Amino acid sequence: VNEAGTFHLICRDCDSKVFQDYENPDNYKDIPSIKMLAQIDMKNNLKNISKRLMEKEMYDIMRERIGVREEWSQAKKDVNDLDLNEFKEAYARAKKRSLKPFSGDYYIGYYAKLPYVVPVAFQGTIALIFDLEGNVINNVYNQDPKYKIMNMSLCIFPLKTTSIIMMFVSKDNNRYGRFFKQLKKLGNLNEQLSVINYILFSY
């Protein structure tokens, strides 16, 4: 929507077919459907997969061209492989939900429709470290291989005369519950948008 999730490695024909529901501005007259959320989730994970693949190639180039130690390069690639597997699994789940959406597949933790067009468009995943009260959401120092970093999806969609601001998570992600409650308890819309703006430019 307005270039928010433009992913130039996907062919235009595929993009228009696979993601046609969520990329149609007319579908934002109401709260987005589960199918639309699944399509957003799919594209977010495709972007994450592409980023990790490019980073792996970059580490090889750094080793070959500027003499970065092989141990360091391999360690970075090993971490990337873990992320890649998680993003691929998340993409597969999102694709399944897009084809057969069920109520409750996703939870919209925050939604606002603004009566004006915001000057920025964004679509992607963010892994918050703390909530608004300093409680840990994602422990980035946890060394347990079974521990997973959990993302939320943030969408800022400027439309023709309005804007959609939305954050949502998969049904199996319960780490953001307190954060969403804290955000909605803030005094007014401007405070909520200020927090979202801070998150956008901090992560």
Residue spans for each PLM region:
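Alpha-helical structural context detector biased toward long hydrophobic helices
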Residues: 1-203
